[in-house]
Amino acid sequence: MGDERLMKPFDVFITYMSWDGDGKNRPVLAFILGDNTVDVYQITSKYEGKSDAIQAQYFKIDDWAQAGLVTQSYVDTGTLIALSIAAFKDKTLIGHLSENDKQRFLEFLSK
């Protein structure tokens, strides 16, 4: 078993995310770990200018620096994405949600 099994829920990684033939490296929040997959939410710093419906899906990370992020960021809860755990083998853990943000995030999801 590789180091990717050391991944824990609420860890933040940078990984390549693709869509419609394009993509880029983005921060993601590990949420649910399976045997061979990890379900992640994308993290974004883009909030202003989004519709009210989109903003309602964004969870504000209060302790963004502890999460390894360089600016105020939000978890996009609109889509939970399943990725192969093996895809994280060479990825660097940049941080993790604070205890406060973990609790707030779980409350946010339960609404």
Task: List the model feature ranges, each with a label.
Residues 8, 33, 52-54, 68-75:
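A generic structural signal for short, non-catalytic loop/turn and secondary-structure boundary residues
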